[in-house]
Structures are given as C-alpha cells and as structure tokens.
A protein has these predicted regions:
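Flavin-dependent oxidoreductase catalytic core characteristic
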Residues: 1-263
Length: 263
C-alpha cells in the first residue's frame, strides 16, 4: 500500500517502555481537507475558521479519568510484583556468617527490611486506595452524564494527585527493589527491569506528574484562601482539615503562608 501524494506516515521509533504499542505520525503537506472529513464529534471549524466546541468539555475529560484509574491499579500491581521478587530473593540469598558460622539470609539484616517492608505495606495501601478512588470516580461519572458537576473538580484533583503519586511510587519503589537484589536485580531475568520499563512512561502519559502535583497544590491553596476569608461553605470536603492550620497563627508565620494571590 502507498499513501496518496502529500501524505506522509511513519513510526516514531523505539521508546523507553510501552513497546507493545506502536506510535506513529501523520503529516499532510499542501492538502485541503473539507470540514466534513475532520471527524469532528466534539469540535468543528466554522467557515470563518473559528473553533467551536460541542457540549461540555468536562464530559471529554471524564474519559481520561478511566485511563488514570487504570494507572492507579497498574502502579499498585507493579510495585507489588517488584516487592515480591525482592523479598523472595532476600529470603533465599545468604551473605556473611553469624557466630555459629552459618550464612545469614539477607532479609535478616535491618537495612534490607528498612528498604523493603515499607514498600510492601505501601503496595497494599495503594490497592485499597485504588478501590476507594475508583468508586468515587464511577459515582462522579454517573453524575456527569446527568449534567451534575458538583463534585467534578474535587474528583479531578483527587485522581490527578493519586495518579502522580502512585506512578512515582511504583517506579521509585521498583528501583529500590532492584537495588536490594544486587547484581541479580539488574539482570533482565529477575523480572524487575521489565517492570520498570513497563511503568516508566506512566509518570508522563495522561498528565506529566510535575504538572499534576502543581494542580493539587493550587487546589489546596485555593481552599486555604477560602478558610482565611471565612468562606467555609466553599471549602472542599477533602480540605476541611486545613481549618486546623489556620487556628495556629504561629504555624502560618513559620511557613510564611500567603494565599492572597491564589486564583
């Protein structure tokens, strides 16, 4: 098959991870497209060249919520797998001898436990948190279909922060698990490098984590401003705890908190 004149297609090439999915590009040169061929379900361009949005943009974002929910589960599962590999290795791998001249499994060393046990607990916490957030998102999507957007922003922030936190935890935790396995962890046969390659793109796709963390920060500061101005009724349910912060003037002075410029 050959493309038509003026049409260029190609593959973007190898990536760090997500190799099972092919990503390509499409380029048009000196081609006129009729407006009827733009597949414009949610947008259209008028005869004057103006972009017109159809429907509520929030409904479009609700589709992204489903992908971010999947990323929460994938992150929890990935960290759990990495921890399981590292713990099993630590129980079998022996290093140095005790007073009885018996080699000691490295899981007996305090440093190994210090690095792995919190990750084990975190993986279970991530799974339970994922289930709770999934229920919240599903309920919000039901409300959105009914034209109710009361809880939409709060759900968006909750999911954005969770996506950034979970994907960062999964990748950083898998690196620690690899290090806990020494040279064996670096080998592809350990399984951990493959996990890391799979989840590495998750910190970027569906919202780069730094941007998502900043969105959460802005949301918190906005609610802090409401509290400072006495507009308690506008404070998000998830931010009620911030009222305790403003009960302590000393704490405010310590951190030099200024919420007056937050939009």
């Amino acid at each position: 098959h050959e493309v038509l004149p003026g049409v260029e297609i190609g593959d973007i090439g190898p990536k760090l991870g997500y190799m099972a999915k092919e990503n390509g590009y499409l380029r048009f040169k000196d081609i006129k497209l009729p407006s009827s061929a733009l597949l414009s379900r949610f947008w259209e361009i008028s005869k004057n060249g103006e972009l017109i949005t159809k429907g509520n943009p929030k409904i479009l974002y609700s589709a992204m919520m489903k992908v971010r929910i999947f990323l929460l589960l994938a992150s929890a599962q990935a960290l759990g797998k990495s921890v399981a590999i590292a713990l099993r290795y630590s129980c079998l791998r022996k290093q140095f001898k005790d007073s009885q001249k018996q080699e000691i499994p490295i899981i007996s060393y305090q440093l190994q436990r210090y690095k792995l046990f919190p990750l084990l607990a975190r993986s279970f916490a991530m799974l339970s948190t994922y289930k709770k957030i999934k229920d919240i998102v599903n309920q919000t999507n039901i409300e959105v279909k009914q034209g109710i957007f009361k809880n939409f922003q709060e759900t968006h922030i909750l999911l954005s922060g969770s996506k950034a936190l979970f994907t960062s935890w999964a990748l950083d935790g898998s690196v620690i698990c690899m290090q806990c396995c020494g040279g064996h962890g670096y080998a592809q046969s350990s399984g951990i490098p493959g996990i890391m390659q799979t989840i590495a793109p998750n910190t970027i796709l569906e919202g780069e984590n730094t941007v998502l963390f900043l969105q959460v920060g802005q949301f918190l500061l906005k609610n802090a401003r409401y509290i400072k101005e006495g507009k308690i009724e506008r404070v998000s349910n998830h931010c009620k705890y911030l009222t305790q912060l403003f009960e302590s003037e000393q704490l405010i002075d310590t951190f030099k908190i200024d919420v007056s410029t937050v939009n």
